[in-house]
Amino acid sequence: MKRKVYVGMDVHKETIQIAYLTSNSKEILKEQQIKHNEVQIKKFIKKLKLEWNEIHCCYEAGVTGYPLYRYLKSLGVNCILLAPGKIPRQNTDKIKTDKRDAIKLARLMRSWRIGIDSCFPVEEDEAVRDYLRSRDSLRLDLGRNRQRLMKFLLRKDIKLLPTTKYWTVSHYKWLNNLHFNNEILQETFNDYYSRVRVQEENLKAMDKKIQEIAESEPYREKVGILRCFRGVDYLTAMFLLCEVNDFKPIQNGRFVHEFSWTCSWRIFQRFQKKTNRDYVKLEVPRLRRILTEAAWQHRFPGTGSKIITARRSGQPALVVALAEKASLRLHKKFRNLQPKRKKLLK
């Protein structure tokens, strides 16, 4: 019986393109396509186990999620789930087919040029992450419906007073008192307005549920530590925990930049030219937005507000010191990035 076989998989909704090779042979042993269901996968793995002792599989993370990964693990197969940004790509590699992708993954896995596999969440953490992403989608839908409502009013030449801000108590009073002589226009306005109100209530309910999850185990301690930092509350802390999932590989801020692509475009171009690799920002857009919004709170120097002091009560002194150090550093960075104003000559 032979020892090792390396299997590259290009996974789709209905099918899986497979290519596998051994450590001794440079040629692909076999290529085939199977249906994406447990019966066909189990049959394929059982056939491989009759010929090889060790089976190493890998596939690229995508919209199919983690069920295939968990199922292969349950069959006793060593499976690696790869993040798309971790796969090395050549500038000359312009042709992309299922067959070529499967062969490339198998060869990369055999030569161990794929690095570490992406950290995947357990089913409970994945459920919380999906709930957070659903909340983010609701936030975007609410913003779109608010725009539709205001554009509808603008088309009818109904404008808000310049002194009144949008979506405040006075704005809602103004909307409640709006009436149209045309019955169809009134129904249209009611439809737009009711969507906004319903989604606002749903958003508040989801925020309340997220806070309850954050205050329960196993998130309570980690959320409490993250809330010591300015700009981080329950929602931001839960997004960080669920999107990053594992903070152990993170050694410094540069790793976070590479993971979330929060660096500037100039640094990105310099890094791309140095490594001669093409990167696309397609992994964690929500994490980039959350980190940017949190960092934006450090425009002003920290004055030790009552809210931050209450969050830090009961937390380790080392965490509080690091949070204060980070706040001062980010504020200093913001001040250095500001354009220098020339003094006016008298």
UniProtKB/Swiss-Prot annotation:
Secretion signal: which residues?
none
Gene Ontology annotations of biological process type: DNA transposition
Gene source species: Leptospira borgpetersenii
* Biological role stated in the UniProt entry: Required for the transposition of the insertion element.
Q: Does the keyword DNA-binding apply?
A: yes
Write the protein's name.
Transposase for insertion sequence element IS1533
Keyword Secreted, does the record have it?
no
Task: State the InterPro entries in the record.
Answer: Transp_IS110-like_N, Transpos_IS110
Q: Which domain of life is it from?
A: Bacteria
Instruction: Please provide, alphabetically and separated by semicolons, the GO molecular function terms listed in this UniProt record.
Output: DNA binding; transposase activity
Pfam families, A to Z: DEDD_Tnp_IS110
Output the NCBIfam families linked to this UniProt entry: transpos_IS110 (NF033542)
Q: Return the similarity comment.
A: Belongs to the transposase IS1111A/IS1328/IS1533 family.
Q: Which UniProt keywords apply?
A: DNA recombination, DNA-binding, Transposable element, Transposition
